[in-house]
């Protein structure tokens, strides 16, 4: 039976972990290295860092954060945010990341996915997609890809499912799908979106956006078909521990790595 992964997500801004609702109203959640070490000790299967700092002047801070984190944790670390070139990817991998996550830059330069996969291997390339439901009531479900998610998200006109298919064809080895409608709202994943993606993806899919309880993660796996489930708020602010989630899943027959 395939073991499902539990992944805490750390949004890093100017060297601190923050968390907002639908990308806004950020609350400070602590030091990234300290949080990463705590999640490592608590039994997390992987960690994701997203650098949401707007200023390129502060990008060096993220490299330092990754270096310090890699020295403290012994689980896979994915880093995304502001990676616009193969050199950017190399810099993060050299600092200690195991995988890099591409989002906005890949939309504007899809060949970046292929270039990264050729240089580092598909297993290193995660395509992260921020998707928003755009169908009118009564219409078949449809989601659009947005970039620059934050205070000023930009619609791309790209259909999320078609973009994910293309990203996989270009060499992405994993998909992280984030529902913009659910992000930070703690109402559960967009299961319809998740199902649409897992139905067409030959590579692992990570569910993101909307977790409020272990049951939401259970539904993401059992109903949505996710290979891994990502969460931020419920972990950062002490609502649930990684152990709480794994215990809940294991009691309901989901295979997880216990510590």
Curated annotation (Swiss-Prot):
Q: Which Pfam families match?
A: His_biosynth
Membrane as a keyword of this entry, yes or no, is no
Q: Which GO terms describe its biological process?
A: L-histidine biosynthetic process
Can you cite an annotated GO cellular component?
cytoplasm
User: Which terms does the record give in the GO molecular function aspect?
Assistant: imidazoleglycerol-phosphate synthase activity; lyase activity
Active site residues per record:
11, 130
* Functional note: IGPS catalyzes the conversion of PRFAR and glutamine to IGP, AICAR and glutamate. The HisF subunit catalyzes the cyclization activity that produces IGP and AICAR from PRFAR using the ammonia provided by the HisH subunit.
Q: Which PANTHER family match?
A: IMIDAZOLE GLYCEROL PHOSPHATE SYNTHASE HISHF, IMIDAZOLE GLYCEROL PHOSPHATE SYNTHASE SUBUNIT HISF/H IGP SYNTHASE SUBUNIT HISF/H
Subunit structure and binding partners: Heterodimer of HisH and HisF.
Query: What is the name attached to this protein's record?
Result: Imidazole glycerol phosphate synthase subunit HisF
């Amino acid at each position: 039976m395939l073991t499902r992964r539990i992944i805490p997500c750390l949004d890093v801004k100017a060297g601190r972990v923050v968390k907002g609702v639908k990308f806004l109203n950020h609350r400070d959640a602590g030091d990234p290295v300290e949080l990463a070490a705590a999640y490592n000790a608590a039994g997390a299967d992987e960690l994701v860092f997203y650098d949401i700092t707007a200023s390129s002047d502060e990008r060096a801070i993220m490299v330092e954060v990754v270096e310090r984190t890699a020295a403290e944790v012994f689980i896979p670390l994915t880093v995304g945010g502001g990676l616009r070139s193969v050199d950017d990817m190399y810099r993060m991998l050299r600092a200690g990341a195991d995988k890099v996550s591409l989002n906005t830059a890949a939309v504007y330069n899809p060949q970046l996915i292929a270039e990264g996969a050729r240089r580092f291997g598909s297993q290193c390339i995660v395509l992260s997609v921020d998707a928003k439901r755009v169908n009118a009531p009564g219409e078949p479900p449809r989601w659009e890809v947005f970039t620059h998610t934050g205070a000023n998200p930009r619609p791309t006109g790209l259909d999320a499912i078609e973009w994910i298919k293309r990203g996989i064809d270009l060499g992405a080895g994993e998909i992280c799908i984030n529902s913009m409608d659910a992000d930070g709202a703690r109402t559960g994943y967009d299961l319809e979106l998740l199902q649409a993606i897992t139905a067409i993806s030959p590579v692992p899919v990570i569910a993101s956006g909307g977790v409020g309880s272990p049951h939401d993660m259970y539904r993401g796996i059992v109903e949505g078909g996710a290979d891994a489930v990502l969460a931020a708020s419920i972990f950062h602010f002490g609502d649930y521990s990684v152990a709480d989630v794994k215990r809940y899943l294991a009691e309901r027959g989901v295979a997880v790595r216990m510590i």
